[in-house]
Amino acid sequence: MRVTMRRVLLAVGSVVALMVTLHLGQQVLECQHVLSKRRHRLMRPENEELVMVDSNHVEYRYSKEMPLIFIGGVPRSGTTLMRAMLDAHPEVRCGEETRIIPRVLAMRQAWSKSGREKMRLDEAGVTDQVLDAAMQAFILEVIAKHGEPARYLCNKDPFTLKSSVYLSRLFPNSKFLLMVRDGRASVHSMITRKVTIAGFDLNCYRDCLTKWNKAIEVMYSQCLEIGRSRCLPVYYEQLVLHPEQSMHAIMKFLGISWSDTVLHHEELIGKPGGVSLSKIERSTDQVIKPVNMEALSKWIGHIPGDVLQDMAHIAPMLARLGYDPYANPPNYGHPDPLVVNNTHRVLKGDYKTPANLKGHLQVTQNTSSSH
């Protein structure tokens, strides 16, 4: 009887142990499945959204699919004016230069160009797919969180447009505004305002014009490669002479509804939901003024004669972009009456730098890289 009872208990115990084992096994499998799903979700940041809430408790969702706007060009080509005019729109926020985005883009480009470095990264599992996902997340985070939320976000870092083809792949619905300005004016502005740019010798017009030509050639070529539906060259001179016509074309290109506020950005400087300016950006003291012609032809009479004679060879992009390399002064066109009036008021001294923006404008230089 004892033996029989012992066998029964042993059999029952074995069955219970088997059931417990099966149950635990099922639980382990279920946990692994859940964890696998979580890991898969966590490892795909490009599918996630950033959620931000403004002061009125309106929620905004941002992702790689959003219609980001990138403004760029060679420094001193009107990028700050362009972003200030867009910033004046009630549904757009650009904000100050982040400075960091063009630098990480340059690093990403360097990793791709170096065959040895790319091989090391691939061996370590840091593939192009991994890097691109990280770049997407990083760039979106910086653009979204360095200012107030808005329906449309834009970024203005001049040299980002040296990577516009790459950015167009990271953000498939993004659009690009390439600011184009007479290189002679851009270079004269760099030199006289002491805007330090890596690789540019501010003591030499010839060197700066050569570097300008190289930089704008890269940006313009990438703009053409992206295509007219994604990248719009915006001529600074035409924006200044005909702001309303130019801004209508720009807003149509961006698919954003029209607002007259884009023609009066100076009235929204420092106001909530308006135009935020940096004390240390070199263009701040200019964009506090309305659109005017004051800076259009300041370069005339300052470029050395030997450089003027060789202009077509030093900067062939001038002719390619539609400028006459031998016209001194060139004929940029006739201004709208509004611009004429604005210019008279500026020359009279009607616009002064606000007290909250004084103190740093003349001592801090732009250290953007041309690489």
UniProtKB/Swiss-Prot annotation:
Lumenal topology ranges: 26-371
E.C. code: 2.8.2.20
Record's keyword annotation contains Cytoplasm: no
Intrachain S-S bonds: 94-154, 223-231
Chain positions covered by the region annotation Interaction with peptide substrate: 99-103
Gene Ontology MF: a single term: protein-tyrosine sulfotransferase activity
GO biological process: peptidyl-tyrosine sulfation
Protein's name according to its UniProt entry: Protein-tyrosine sulfotransferase 2
